A protein has these predicted regions:
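ATP-dependent small-molecule kinase phosphotransfer cores
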Residues: 87, 91-141, 147-148
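Conserved phosphate-donor/acceptor-positioning beta-strand/loop module used by diverse small-molecule
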Residues: 142-145, 155-176
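Acidic, Mg2+-coordinating phosphoryl-transfer loop and its flanking beta/alpha structural elements
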Residues: 3-37
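Small-molecule kinase domains that catalyze NTP-dependent phosphoryl transfer to phosphate-bearing small molecules
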Residues: 5, 150, 180-221
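ATP-binding Walker
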Residues: 71
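Walker A/P-loop
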Residues: 74
Length: 227
């Protein structure tokens, strides 16, 4: 646990955790907390995920897609949600023009989100009632999340955490080709190796070299392991 980005990136620790401060708010992808209470809970969740991983999947449940920037989480989510039994819930963020519902920083901070995170300087949040509305239909909730968001989701709902894997060269190429600032591209690339470590505490992993094949693979996994 540290608030200095270079210390977190260079540590040999299996699960480095960033203590959020104003000077590191734009750092992307790392396990992060805002206070010691959140850190203690995060450690408990990592231990539980490592020791008591359950391969049985409740139907319906939340499918949390995690992985480095450029791994294709959003594309995989969109592909899954083209199928009848999968659905994206309503989510909120502080970036205008994004797929999420836009809120100003002031509006966002006034909302009651049960799960929220800051990614590359942008805040994202989810409301419990929006998740419940999708589950009530009998649909799987599909969400690209960072690891902290996925763990928070698992605290409240039946959740399967899926690591979306891709070759590092393709991750870097995808990040470079995106319409991000140089600073944001740099931060996303720097976080790749740290984010790859999170694969060990996920329930499943899918190789996303081809989104169609990854969609079929993950759909089959969910179907074959549902209770």
């Amino acid at each position: 646990l540290d608030d200095a980005i270079h210390n977190v990136l260079e540590t040999p620790a299996t699960y480095p955790v960033l203590m959020r401060k104003p000077w590191n708010s734009k750092m992307t992808g790392l396990l992060s907390v805002n206070n010691i209470t959140e850190f203690v809970y995060l450690v408990e969740q990592i231990i539980n995920a490592s020791l008591y991983r359950n391969k049985n999947i409740k139907n319906p449940s939340v499918v949390a897609l995690v992985g480095p920037s450029g791994s294709g989480k959003t594309a995989l989510s969109d592909s899954l949600c083209a199928m009848e039994q999968f659905e994206n819930p309503k989510t909120y963020c502080t970036k205008p023009g994004d797929k999420h519902r836009y809120l100003t920083e002031e509006e966002f901070n006034a909302q009651d989100f049960f799960e929220k995170t800051r990614y590359a300087g942008i805040q994202y949040g989810t409301k419990m009632e929006d998740i419940e509305a999708v589950l009530a239909k009998g649909h799987f909730v599909v969400m690209p999340l960072d690891m902290c968001g996925a763990i928070a989701m698992k605290r409240h709902f039946p959740t399967v955490i899926v690591y979306v894997a891709r070759d590092k060269e393709l991750l870097i190429r995808d990040i470079i080709e995106q319409d991000y600032s140089i600073e944001e591209k740099t931060l996303r690339i720097l976080s790749i190796d740290a984010e790859k470590r999170n694969r060990q505490i996920c329930d499943y992993a899918v190789n996303n070299m081809d989104v169609g094949a990854a969609t079929r693979e993950l759909s089959d996994v969910l179907e074959n392991n549902c209770l």
